[in-house]
């Protein structure tokens, strides 16, 4: 039975060029569902869902894009933020438990920390 997980990462940007790069990460893996962008908050929210391995790959690629292209030293916006990527919630959709979604979040957090040398709060 195929497992499906949803993820809704929040990025601290409203730059159309960066948003296109971020969306491309999810399109490449066939998991992009939609996105919202708010200029006043300088924030983009992407919704993706699919096979957990594909979602993980897309999220990690998008975090790399965010780390390279979002500079919080010059960031403005009404929304409070902690990083280029603020939150990466995982939601079990089909044939997955909440505990499995939590495990996915721990795997992703560990990979982000190691690959990009940034702090991760779980």
Model-assigned labels for residue ranges:
Residues 1-122:
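Long, contiguous binding/interaction regions
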